[in-house]
Every structure is written in structure tokens, then in C-alpha cells.
């Protein structure tokens, strides 16, 4: 397995500054001295994403580690995000299928309400990601805790993407 931390000449640790990763990648690409731009890009993609970075760190530092059990996520929150994004997608589809301006205007209140709910969820996800990032910065060399944190990041990033896409669909519905 290629050590992607070494590819970008970064310290091997679960938390890295995103700006430092970007700057290192850009300087190595600009120097032209690196033989494989694909490997540089893979290193940046992996190390830029906290969940992927933690998993890569675990694979390098604890190659024999197998998680004892899958960490529990906040499934109530997941269901809340799922319901809000489903409603937003349905609203956007309903609005795009309407041709009469008055019928479209009648949905505006629902669309604005859905957008507000999604914005609150996006804010909550941002807070949870920031809290997870703080815990990652103060990491212990505990593979179980790191694996749990990687799952949490992946869970939150997936929800963040869903909310962002639903907001985009609603924003297009506002036009």
C-alpha cells in the first residue's frame, strides 16, 4: 500500500490542515518533479477527506486492526435528513411539472419552508462536523476510536451531500 502521507510529504497523523494539503499538492504539481500526477491527485483526494484519511492512517499504522463492531450513528438524525430531502425533492418535482404561474406561485411558501428546514439541518451537520474535527485534532492512538470517528465523518458527509443537493433542487424551484 502506498503511503499517501509520504507522497505529499506530510506527517502521518489522522488530522491534517486542509489548506496545508492543498498547498503541498499544488507546489508538487507545479514543480513538475513528481513522476505520477495521478498518485498526487489520489493523495490529495484521500487526505482531504477526513473519513478516507483516517481509514488510510489506520491501514498504515494498524494493518492488523479489524473493528470489533460497527459504530452506532444517530439514526434519528439520519431519518430527519432523509425525510427533509425527500420532501424537498418532491416539492421541486411538483413545481417543475406545473406550467401555470399561479400554480407554481402557490408552492412558494412550501418551498421556502422546506428550504428553511434544510438550512437548519445543514447548520446542524456543520456543527457536528466541527465537533468531530475537534475530537480528531485531539486524537489518541486508539484504532477503535479512530474507526468510529471515520464512520461518523462518512455518515455526516453523506448527509451533508444529501442536504446540499436538496437545497439546490429547491433553489432551482424558486426560479
Question: What label would you give each PLM region?
Answer:
Residues 1-175:
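C-terminal accessory/regulatory regions appended to core domains
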Amino acid at each position: 500500500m502506498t503511503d499517501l502521507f509520504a507522497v505529499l510529504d506530510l506527517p502521518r497523523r489522522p488530522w491534517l490542515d486542509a489548506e496545508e494539503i492543498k498547498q503541498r499538492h499544488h507546489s508538487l504539481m507545479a514543480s513538475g518533479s513528481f513522476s505520477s500526477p495521478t498518485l498526487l491527485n489520489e493523495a490529495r483526494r484521500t487526505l482531504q477527506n477526513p473519513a478516507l484519511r483516517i481509514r488510510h492512517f489506520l491501514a498504515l499504522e494498524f494493518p492488523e486492526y479489524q473493528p470489533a463492531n460497527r459504530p452506532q450513528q444517530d439514526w434519528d438524525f439520519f431519518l430527519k435528513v432523509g425525510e427533509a430531502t425527500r420532501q424537498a425533492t418532491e416539492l421541486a418535482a411538483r413545481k417543475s411539472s406545473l406550467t401555470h404561474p399561479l400554480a407554481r406561485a402557490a408552492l412558494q411558501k412550501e418551498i421556502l419552508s422546506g428550504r428553511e428546514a434544510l438550512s437548519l439541518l445543514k447548520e446542524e451537520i456543520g456543527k457536528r462536523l466541527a465537533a468531530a474535527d475537534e475530537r480528531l485534532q485531539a486524537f489518541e492512538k486508539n484504532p477503535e476510536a479512530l474507526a468510529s470517528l471515520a464512520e461518523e465523518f462518512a455518515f455526516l458527509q453523506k448527509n451533508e451531500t444529501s442536504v446540499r443537493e436538496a437545497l439546490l433542487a429547491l433553489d432551482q424551484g424558486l426560479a
